[in-house]
Design a protein with these regions (language model features):
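Beta-barrel outer-membrane channel/assembly domains of diderm bacteria
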Residues: 1-97, 121-123
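Extracellular loop and loop/strand-boundary signature of outer-membrane beta-barrel proteins
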Residues: 9-12, 64-67, 102-105, 147-154
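Extended aliphatic helical segments
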Residues: 34-35, 63, 101, 117, ...
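Signature for the C-terminal beta-barrel architecture of outer-membrane proteins
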Residues: 86, 108-172
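Outer-membrane beta-barrel and related beta-rich outer-membrane complex signature
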Residues: 49-55, 104, 141-145
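Flexible, active-site-adjacent loop/turn segments at secondary-structure boundaries
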Residues: 5, 100, 112
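"Short basic amphipathic alpha-helical interaction patches in structured regions
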Residues: 95, 104-109
Length: 172
């Protein structure tokens, strides 16, 4: 993955970084019975291939500690326990989420993940009921989990204890 921000300002350096990301996922099935249990797990590794002094900050690698050079690597791992009963599935742990309210996205070298719970139900043909709550996220260019933040509107760089959502989607 290569990112080049040509800033075109005499007072700022360009940010250019090149990296390679590796993502391994394990998704088990469910145990037999009315209530089934399973486990999803992942491991991620991001390697810096290029990003010399003063060129960090493109958003694909972790931000430097002030020297203009991103770390040579970063990694993370996580898991989520899942429980299924009839047409309802509950997941708790580290989640890959994509819905209209919260979406980690895969627009950078490694995807963003969230820590919390999600609940989905597919009892009605064509309809999906979904809800959940998350308290932490792992940004796509970091190793550890952080409290949720937002930079939208007048909120600045505020943190929150959690984000809760619920919704219904239909596919015909």
């Amino acid at each position: 993955y290569y990112m080049n921000h040509d800033i075109r300002s005499p007072h700022a350096d360009d940010s250019k970084e090149w990296g390679q990301g590796f993502l391994g996922k394990f998704e088990s099935g469910f145990t037999q019975g009315v209530v089934g249990f399973g486990l999803d797990a992942y491991a991620m590794l991001g390697l810096k291939l290029d990003g010399g002094g003063g060129t960090d900050g493109s958003s694909i690698l972790p931000v430097s500690d002030g020297n203009g050079k991103a770390p040579t690597s970063f990694s993370s791992a996580g898991a989520a326990l899942k429980i299924r009963a009839f047409d309802t599935e509950l997941k708790a742990g580290d989640l890959f989420l994509t819905n209209p309210v919260i979406a980690g996205g895969e627009t950078r070298m490694l995807p963003q993940t969230f820590r919390g719970v999600s609940l989905t139900n597919n009892s009605f043909e064509g309809w999906m009921l979904e809800g959940g709550q998350v308290s932490f996220d792992k940004p796509y260019n970091q190793s550890g989990m952080h409290r949720l933040t937002t930079t939208y509107g007048d909120l600045g760089d505020q943190t929150t204890k959690h984000l809760t959502w619920a919704g219904v989607s239909w596919s015909g």
